[in-house]
């Protein structure tokens, strides 16, 4: 077989026939994927990654670097250049720049090599579909920069400026229960339940802002299920953070670039550090770093300053959101009928009253499949206040009357329960 490597080149080419083929995006409607996010890794020297809690809380394992994005054709095909001799991962993005699936492995192209794949995590026994696609015959795209040149994704550089601009006006006091989102304080009480040699000697060097905001996101984590993830199972919109913003959290409206930064942070497994020199054990890795640079040159990897990050943004002015007048609606209702297990004894206003307990059997568990249960709870007849004053889309609160009791699921339906139907 003739050698396909061209040592004088610094790039390889990736040809993707159909991003919708394969189980990776099974069920995702055609036309949903608009771009591919292209990233790479700065793999961790000893004691600077993995389960030690060094790069972030519960992940990622290594520092993730954002290279840029490429366009996807309407038929799901794409052809683009990637840096040669570089570990590369891709993430299919929707129209809002949010990953529909997470690639937790990587591939590497030799200089001048053309790599091809049929789809997103297609079966290794699949063969290419014999049809011409739109990307075929086109000049391979160059990767488009993403809000600047290639760099490690750092919370302090990418996410904290967003919080400084939109959030710190209400989230900068320590004497209340709100998340503290200023980037000026560091946590001192970090612990880890993950197996390994995690300790504050290596891990937990994060700001309180990161620790508090981290609670509002959902992503695979560092030791997630090794099986392929369900498409959109960890989509950014599944997180409480994105849902709050979408609901109009006290009328806070982020610009599109800021929303993209939050989405990328979630898609990258919510890291804190974006370079080695910011990690506490950096001084202990001198030999590893020296050998790494030697091997990069020896094996033709692109020369990169892996420690480069732009200067930390300063002087960001807080933008106070407009607070339109809203009608909060009803705020009190006598004779609230629902069961409160914390009330001892349960007293509603002037007399004991619990319409739910009065129903007798008001809880029920149904086995909908072997080992899969659905817990139900009975709502009594009566009146209640529907809505909340927490978010604009939950107002105005309204008194609603229920004419007769009915059963309802006690919790949201899980994917496992849904599949049982």
PLM features: what roles do these ranges have?
Residues 29-59:
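Extended low-complexity, serine/threonine- and proline-enriched intrinsically disordered segments
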Residues 227-229, 323-421:
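Extended beta-strand/loop cores of jelly-roll/beta-sandwich
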Residues 75-81, 406-407:
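Short, surface-exposed beta-strand/beta-hairpin micro-motifs centered on an aromatic residue
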Residues 1-4, 18, 33, 85-87, ...:
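Aromatic- and Gly/Pro-enriched helix-to-coil junctions and flexible linker segments
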Residues 15-27, 168:
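Short amphipathic, basic-aromatic surface patches that mediate peripheral association
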């Amino acid at each position: 077989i003739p050698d396909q490597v061209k040592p004088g080149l610094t790039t390889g080419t990736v040809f993707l026939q159909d991003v919708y083929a394969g189980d990776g995006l099974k069920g995702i409607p055609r036309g949903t994927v608009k771009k591919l996010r292209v990233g790479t890794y700065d793999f961790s020297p000893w004691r600077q990654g993995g389960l030690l809690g060094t790069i972030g809380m519960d992940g990622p394992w290594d520092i993730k670097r954002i290279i840029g994005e490429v366009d996807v054709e309407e038929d799901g095909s794409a052809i683009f250049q990637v840096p040669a001799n570089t570990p590369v991962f891709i993430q299919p993005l929707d129209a809002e720049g949010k990953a529909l699936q997470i690639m937790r492995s990587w591939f590497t192209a030799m200089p001048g090599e053309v790599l091809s794949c049929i789809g997103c995590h297609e079966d290794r026994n699949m063969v290419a579909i014999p049809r011409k696609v739109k990307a075929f015959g086109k000049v391979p795209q160059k990767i488009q920069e993403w809000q600047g040149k290639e760099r490690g994704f750092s919370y302090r550089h990418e996410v904290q400026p967003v919080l400084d601009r939109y959030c710190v006006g209400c989230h900068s006091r320590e004497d209340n229960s709100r998340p503290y989102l200023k980037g000026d304080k560091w946590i001192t009480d970090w612990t880890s339940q993950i197996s390994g040699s995690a300790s504050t000697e290596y891990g937990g060097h994060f700001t309180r802002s990161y620790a508090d905001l981290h609670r509002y996101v959902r992503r695979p984590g560092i030791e997630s299920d090794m099986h392929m993830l369900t498409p959109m199972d960890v989509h950014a919109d599944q997180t409480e953070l994105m849902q709050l913003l979408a609901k109009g959290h006290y009328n806070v409206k982020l610009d599109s670039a800021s929303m993209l930064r939050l989405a990328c942070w979630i898609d990258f497994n919510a890291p804190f550090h974006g370079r080695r020199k910011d990690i506490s054990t950096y001084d202990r890795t001198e030999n590893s770093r020296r050998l790494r640079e030697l091997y990069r040159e020896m094996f033709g990897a692109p020369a990169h300053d892996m420690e480069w990050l732009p200067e930390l943004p300063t002087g960001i002015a807080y933008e106070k959101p407009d607070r339109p007048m809203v009608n909060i609606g009803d705020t009190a209702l006598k004779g609230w009928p629902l069961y409160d297990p914390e009330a001892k004894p349960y007293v509603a206003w002037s007399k004991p009253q619990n319409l739910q307990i009065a129903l007798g059997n008001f809880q029920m568990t149904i086995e909908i499949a072997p080992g899969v249960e659905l817990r139900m709870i009975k709502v009594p007849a009566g009146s209640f206040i529907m809505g909340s004053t927490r978010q604009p889309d939950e107002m105005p609160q309204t008194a609603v009357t229920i004419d007769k009791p009915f059963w309802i699921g006690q919790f949201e339906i899980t994917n496992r329960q849904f599949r049982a139907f």
